[in-house]
Amino acid sequence: MRRVLFAVLAVVSLFTLPPGRAGLLAAAELQPLEIASKSGVHVFAVEMAVTPEEQAKGLMFRKQLPEGQGMLFDFHREQPTSFWMKNTYVPLDMIFIRADGRILRIAENTVPLSETLVPSGGPVLAVLEVVAGTAKKLGIAAGDRVAHPIFNSR
């Protein structure tokens, strides 16, 4: 049912999003990701950052990020990492995720344009960036499980 809903939303967004809007992701580039928390299952549409170039740029220079969308950074192996908000205009929640899909740590409401490092707090396979306030609003916390093909598939 969630996949059908996601497909319908993706098609609708193709016709409702204005062309050429910086910061909005094309529906064809988005993949579904689910987070199971105590408050329920939350579905996101994520853009993948898998190459070093994609990861270095991340969400830099974008002026907006719609609720329910995000960027998933896949490091291909577990490792400690740090992020920053240089050239990033949208405040974010950074969700650090282990290879088993469990959330290790959440850095909430990161400061736009800050060059202060935001550490993972341990080895992670991926980081999910979403609009600031999302984790608190949805009750997402450390220990919650993330479902996406990159987890437990290696």
Per-region residue spans from a language model:
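Bacterial N-terminal signal peptides
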Residues: A7-R21
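Positively charged n-region of N-terminal signal peptides that target proteins for export
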Residues: M1-V4
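Compact, glycine-rich, soluble single-domain proteins
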Residues: G23-R154
